[in-house]
């Protein structure tokens, strides 16, 4: 029995949840999100609560049950509050700049790295070494932050690279001199 799938999700005030045969649409203050629902999962919204049920007890149905419930919870939170990921850039000469709808990163390569910002995402730079990724879709915010981090992951010796704000990098000791 999926405990996550059986959760009742409270609909915050000011949000509108529309359920179609294979779709759930959530409209809120920050925008609108849409999620396709598999045929084995049934979503019901009434009296300010969203519930999900599955048609059978096949393993795949059980897996989808919890996943869809969590995705809908993320949608409810996203259109009401939004999501935010913060990244930090460490390293001499490493910095970021916004040029139109592109994020330009100087990360020690022979050329600047340009990242096109997708629709529905806002990126702000309080400092040239700090990037804030914001949006209503939890999946998209996480994906954009991961893509930016992948351009130069933090290395274990000096910690240079792009890391999440509260990420702890396990450091290694360098080569020791001869005896």
Swiss-Prot record:
- Quote the cellular component terms of the Gene Ontology held in the record: cytosolic large ribosomal subunit
Q: Which cysteines are joined by disulfide bonds?
A: none
Record keywords, A-Z: Ribonucleoprotein, Ribosomal protein, RNA-binding, rRNA-binding
Q: Which SUPFAM superfamilies match?
A: Ribosomal protein L6
User: PROSITE patterns of this UniProt entry?
Assistant: RIBOSOMAL_L6_1 (PS00525)
The answer to keyword Transcription applying to this record is no
- Pfam annotation, one family: Ribosomal_L6
Positions the record marks as coiled coil are none
Molecular-function annotations in GO: rRNA binding; structural constituent of ribosome
Q: What are the BP-aspect GO terms?
A: cytoplasmic translation
Which InterPro entries does this entry report, sorted A to Z?
Ribosomal_uL6-like, Ribosomal_uL6-like_a/b-dom_sf, Ribosomal_uL6_a/b-dom, Ribosomal_uL6_bac-type, Ribosomal_uL6_CS
Q: What does this protein do?
A: This protein binds to the 23S rRNA, and is important in its secondary structure. It is located near the subunit interface in the base of the L7/L12 stalk, and near the tRNA binding site of the peptidyltransferase center.
Which family does the UniProt entry place this protein in?
Belongs to the universal ribosomal protein uL6 family.
Subunit structure as annotated in this protein's UniProt entry: Part of the 50S ribosomal subunit.
Q: What is this protein called?
A: Large ribosomal subunit protein uL6
Organism of origin: Spiroplasma citri
Record gene name:
rplF
């Amino acid at each position: 029995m999926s405990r996550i799938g059986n959760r009742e999700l409270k609909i915050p005030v000011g949000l509108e949840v529309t359920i179609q045969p294979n779709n759930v649409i959530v409209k809120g203050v920050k925008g609108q999100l849409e999620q396709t629902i598999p045929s084995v999962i049934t979503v019901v919204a009434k009296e300010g609560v969203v519930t999900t049920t599955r048609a059978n007890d096949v393993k795949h149905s059980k897996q989808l049950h919890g996943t869809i419930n969590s995705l809908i919870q993320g949608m409810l939170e996203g259109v009401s509050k939004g999501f935010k990921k913060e990244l930090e850039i460490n390293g001499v000469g490493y910095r970021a700049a916004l040029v139109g709808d592109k994020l330009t990163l100087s990360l020690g390569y022979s050329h600047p790295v340009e990242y096109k910002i997708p629709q529905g995402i806002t990126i702000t730079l309080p400092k040239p070494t700090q990037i804030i990724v914001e949006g209503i879709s939890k999946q998209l915010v996480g994906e954009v932050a991961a893509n930016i981090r992948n351009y130069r992951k933090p290395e274990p010796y000096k910690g240079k690279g792009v890391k999440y704000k509260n990420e702890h990098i396990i450091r290694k000791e360098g080569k020791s001199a001869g005896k």
